[in-house]
């Protein structure tokens, strides 16, 4: 039985010594296709972006740059905001890890919500929606951290060691029960 070798998946010491004797492995970061030409890459990216914009403009007959409908197979109509489902204009959800803020805290002192125009592709010049005004993201995260340190479901323990579920068993119980 002394000839039998049981492997645990790792190489034997002899193989490890032989591997170290070889020249050291090169870095895993390799330049497979030569140096990057950043100007050419930027030009290609711009061309691809323009091609995608033109394809979308042809497909939907809508000028997404100027937010204007174009002539084509679709007939665009302006719609009142109240006739749309809420999910088209409500503010995005907070991240999953964020605490829930009571409604009273997100309102100003008079208890009213402020109308804030949307930015980017969601906004038209006349669109304003009732949303809570956002400040700097660092301020929001600091505020959430302060709010999250409130009531806990289970108090934090001062012990550095985790509690063992079997801690109340004595040695007699352990030897009798097994």
UniProtKB/Swiss-Prot annotation:
Residues 1-11, 104-113 have a biased composition (Polar residues). This is Cyclin-dependent kinase inhibitor 1B. Belongs to the CDI family. Coiled coil: none annotated. The modification Phosphotyrosine is found at residues 74, 88-89. Residues 126-137 have a biased composition (Basic and acidic residues). The modification Phosphoserine is found at residue 10. A motif (Nuclear localization signal) lies at residues 153-169. Gene3D superfamilies: p27. One of its GO terms (biological process) is negative regulation of cell population proliferation. The modification Phosphothreonine is found at residues 157, 170. One of its GO terms (cellular component) is nucleus. Important regulator of cell cycle progression. Inhibits the kinase activity of CDK2 bound to cyclin A, but has little inhibitory activity on CDK2 bound to SPDYA. Involved in G1 arrest. Potent inhibitor of cyclin E- and cyclin A-CDK2 complexes. Forms a complex with cyclin type D-CDK4 complexes and is involved in the assembly, stability, and modulation of CCND1-CDK4 complex activation. Acts either as an inhibitor or an activator of cyclin type D-CDK4 complexes depending on its phosphorylation state and/or stoichometry. Residues 51-91 are annotated as: Interaction with CDK2. Its main location: nucleus. Keywords: Cell cycle, Cytoplasm, Endosome, Nucleus, Phosphoprotein, Protein kinase inhibitor, Ubl conjugation. Forms a ternary complex composed of CCNE1, CDK2 and CDKN1B. Interacts directly with CCNE1; the interaction is inhibited by CDK2-dependent phosphorylation. Interacts with COPS5, subunit of the COP9 signalosome complex; the interaction leads to CDKN1B degradation. Interacts with NUP50; the interaction leads to nuclear import and degradation of phosphorylated CDKN1B. Interacts with CCND1 and SNX6. Residues 1-31, 87-178 are annotated as: Disordered. PANTHER family: CYCLIN-DEPENDENT KINASE INHIBITOR 1, CYCLIN-DEPENDENT KINASE INHIBITOR 1B. It is found in: Nucleus; Cytoplasm; Endosome. Phosphorylated; phosphorylation occurs on serine, threonine and tyrosine residues. Phosphorylation on Ser-10 is the major site of phosphorylation in resting cells, takes place at the G(0)-G(1) phase and leads to protein stability. Phosphorylation on other sites is greatly enhanced by mitogens, growth factors, MYC and in certain cancer cell lines. The phosphorylated form found in the cytoplasm is inactivate. Phosphorylation on Tyr-88 has no effect on binding CDK complexes. GO terms for molecular function: cyclin-dependent protein serine/threonine kinase inhibitor activity; protein-folding chaperone binding.
């Amino acid at each position: 039985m002394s000839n039998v070798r049981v492997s645990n998946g790792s190489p034997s010491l002899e193989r490890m010594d032989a591997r170290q004797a070889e020249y050291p492995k090169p870095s895993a970061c390799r330049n497979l296709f030569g140096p990057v030409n950043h100007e050419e890459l930027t030009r290609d990216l711009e061309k691809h972006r323009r091609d995608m914009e033109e394809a979308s403009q042809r497909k939907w007959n809508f000028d997404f740059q100027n937010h204007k409908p174009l002539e084509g197979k679709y007939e665009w109509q302006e719609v009142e905001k109240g006739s749309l489902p809420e999910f088209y204009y409500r503010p995005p959800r907070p991240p999953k890890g964020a605490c829930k803020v009571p409604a009273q805290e997100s309102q100003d002192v008079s208890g009213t919500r402020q109308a804030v125009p949307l930015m980017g592709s969601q906004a038209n010049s006349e669109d304003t929606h009732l949303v809570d005004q956002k400040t700097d993201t660092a301020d929001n995260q600091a505020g959430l951290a302060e709010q999250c340190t409130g009531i806990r479901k289970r108090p934090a323990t001062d012990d550095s060691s985790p509690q063992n579920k079997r801690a109340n068993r004595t040695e007699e119980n352990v030897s009798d029960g097994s």
